[in-house]
Amino acid sequence: MAEFELEVLQPERVFFKDNVEMIVLRTIDGEIGIMANHQPIVVPIGIGKLRIKKDGKWREAAIAGGLLEVKNNKATILSDAVEWPEEIDRQRALLAKERAEKRLEQKLPPDEYERYRAALYRALNRLKLAEENKEEI
């Protein structure tokens, strides 16, 4: 299968950089798959899983939103938070979930409500990915 370059960047590190066969991730409009020679695009990424296929095998990471750019057979992802399942601190994610749920029970201005709703989705995404990959860690 043809490959393309994938680079996943965070403010503090290069999370991933290698040639891959395919990636699948959630945009704000739904799930998208990218393969070699994909048309140029720039799309916002939603909270969810980043699935990477390399050498015929899939690997998943939790991603907390960001931006995807594809051009010239290269995909670049910019995100504040991307984690492999083994990097996820389950206890910290559980505390973040509980904190967000508690705040969402209160009457909040719309901007604060959206911030805590996103925090809840991030925590749930991290917990789900960690649970699904518990046996592999």
Curated annotation (Swiss-Prot):
Location (main, coarse): membrane
Membrane protein topology class: Peripheral membrane protein
GO cellular component: plasma membrane; proton-transporting ATP synthase complex
Protein family (similarity comment): Belongs to the ATPase epsilon chain family.
Assembly notes: F-type ATPases have 2 components, CF(1) - the catalytic core - and CF(0) - the membrane proton channel. CF(1) has five subunits: alpha(3), beta(3), gamma(1), delta(1), epsilon(1). CF(0) has three main subunits: a, b and c.
The name this protein goes by in its record: ATP synthase epsilon chain
CDD domains according to UniProt: F1-ATPase_delta
PANTHER family: ATP SYNTHASE DELTA/EPSILON CHAIN, ATP SYNTHASE EPSILON CHAIN, CHLOROPLASTIC
Keyword Ligase annotated: no
Keyword Oxidoreductase: no
MF-aspect GO terms: ATP binding; proton-transporting ATP synthase activity, rotational mechanism
Compartments, as annotated in UniProt: Cell membrane
Keywords: ATP synthesis, Cell membrane, CF(1), Hydrogen ion transport, Ion transport, Membrane, Transport
Biological role: Produces ATP from ADP in the presence of a proton gradient across the membrane.
Gene3D superfamilies: ATP synthase delta/epsilon subunit, C-terminal domain (1.20.5.440), F0F1 ATP synthase delta/epsilon subunit, N-terminal (2.60.15.10)
